[in-house]
Amino acid sequence: MKCSADVLIVGGGIIGCSIAYFLRKQGAEVIVLEKGDIGAQASSAAAGLLAPIRPLCQRDPFKVLQLAGLVRFSSFVPELEAVSGITVGYEQTGTLRLLPAEKLDAVQAWAEVWQHAGYHIEVLTPQEAYTRQPNLSSGLYGAVTIAEEAQVVPVQLVQAYAQAALNLGALLYAHTEVVALQRSERGSRITGLWTNQGDLLTCNQLILAAGAWSARCGTWLGIKLPVRPVRGELIALEQPSLPVRHIIFDEGIFDEDIYIAPKLNGTVVVGATKADVGFDTSVSAGGVLHLLTVATQLLPALAHCPIHRMWAGLRPKTPDSRPLLGPIPSWENVVIASGHGGFGVLLSAITGEMVVELVTTGTIPEIIRPFVPKENIVDEVNSHKREDAQGI
């Protein structure tokens, strides 16, 4: 095991592997530490949607970041596939967003604003919506289509990031937990990490990309990182005889968290629930019932489709549902990239590029300034910063 690198990354999910890839492009020596298998947590459990434009949404800083992530993906996929040798299943499927009655009056003016900004958005009558997707349930009020929205196969995407990083010379250590940290004499720099293998890995820079487990990293640093796991359950069904053509979103008719996404393997993914149940990744009967109830109310034909599989993953969520991106206060060489919630896939490339720009130039990119951890992150231990750590 190589025991030193310019940068150590804690977390081998889609964010950690993306950062590793972009760092290697800049020539930095990189080691990624992952407590389980590479990309086996939220990255592999996601639906892989690249669809941030909800009807009536506004372009606040988080939406600006999401839109940048969407634009970056379409141009970045050929590069990633070429370097990794892995296809990521990118499809610009477009979305069909089904509207409740209370959104109809405002949506036309909203759509015109976004159309003027260059997005291909259409407001549909019920009959036009049925033409796009004939097996929708009756009684629709209207819909919005957004051509730019897309999807990928998340398992293949995280594998591509990891393989691309490896092909450029990064080192990825699976089943390697951090158990303690080494500090500089002044105590404001991390100089290395001890692992459960008994190795001390030294570094100039530490990046925390541990997803739902990021709060545990905070205990090493004497701070509270406000990231918690939120379970999302999903079901894959076999396609109905009249196939689902677009990613369909319920925009508040029954449950605005529910979507139906057709996949290249002939399945339709229905997601996703949200549950604060700690690190429990079991699939609940109630979650399955809710997903199938809403999905079959939107597309009755799904009631006759065989279940292909069911699964759950943990999203890293912050109190304001915005990511933490940037330097950790009071530490000279620690950066966090976590808390992406359900947008980790969408934001993977833009996060990797922006974090690498920060690390290599020392300047915080303007687009991530709103997400830099604030000085008021709670000190939950004491002023001298703990050296021990829980394995993540």
Placement of each model-derived feature along the sequence:
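Helical element adjacent to the flavin cofactor pocket in flavoenzyme catalytic cores
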Residues: 144-197, 201-205
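Helix-loop-beta segment of a Rossmann-like dinucleotide-binding subdomain
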Residues: 86-97, 110-117, 121-168, 273-277, ...
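Active-site substrate-recognition segment that forms the wall
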Residues: 21-26, 35, 48-49, 86-91, ...
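N-terminal Rossmann-like FAD-binding beta1-loop-alpha1 element of flavoenzymes
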Residues: 5-31
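Dinucleotide-binding Rossmann-like beta1-alpha1 core, especially the glycine-rich loop
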Residues: 48-132, 294-296
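C-terminal catalytic lobe of FAD-dependent flavoproteins
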Residues: 299-392
